[in-house]
């Protein structure tokens, strides 16, 4: 449970960083908004935890499925933001905007995530809000960031395989 609280702090730090996105980009992206969001978040997570995780395909799919299953077209979340699969030691959380709505990013906000200022804001927010120790980070075996675009908003979730503490 302690690890879940720490991971929730990580995700809330991400929400704070995502909330800082206000500038608009004017370039046409080569990747979809969802792919851009996934790339930016995995980079920011790695810098925050001082790791070098790849965006694990299985975990990315868990995150995408959570968004598809739990987030309505209006951004409202059904049955909570957290998905825990104790048998497979997987935890997934959808980035929240408030207590009942997922954080929906516009295409302009997603494009802004490429800016190094986003990564710096995320890292600073994460380090300020999280109390993950090196031992906690070492228990993370794989991470994945999944994003799904519904209508004009892109929703982001994080999934991780976590080795239980002994």
Cite the ranges covered by each PLM segment.
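C-terminal motif of bacterial Sec signal peptides marking the signal peptidase cleavage site
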Residues: 19-23
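Sec-dependent N-terminal signal peptides
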Residues: 8-16
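Bacterial Sec-dependent N-terminal signal peptides
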Residues: 1-8
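A well-ordered secondary-structure block
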Residues: 88-166
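Short, well-ordered surface patches within globular domains
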Residues: 29-91, 95
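Bacterial signal peptide processing site
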Residues: 25-27
């Amino acid at each position: 449970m302690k690890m879940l609280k720490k991971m929730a702090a990580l995700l809330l730090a991400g929400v704070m960083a995502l909330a800082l996105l206000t500038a608009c980009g004017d370039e046409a992206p080569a990747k979809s908004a969802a792919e851009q969001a996934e790339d930016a978040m995995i980079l920011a997570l790695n810098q925050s935890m001082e790791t070098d995780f790849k965006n694990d395909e299985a975990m990315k799919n868990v995150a995408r499925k959570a968004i598809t299953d739990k987030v309505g077209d209006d951004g409202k979340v059904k049955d909570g933001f957290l998905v825990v699969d104790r048998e497979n030691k997987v935890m997934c959380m959808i980035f929240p905007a408030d207590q009942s709505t997922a954080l929906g990013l516009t295409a302009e906000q997603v494009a802004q995530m490429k800016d190094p200022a986003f990564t710096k804001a995320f890292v600073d927010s994460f380090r300020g809000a999280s109390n993950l120790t090196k031992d906690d980070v070492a228990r993370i075996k794989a991470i994945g960031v999944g994003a799904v675009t519904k209508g004009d908003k892109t929703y982001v979730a994080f999934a991780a395989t976590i080795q239980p503490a002994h």
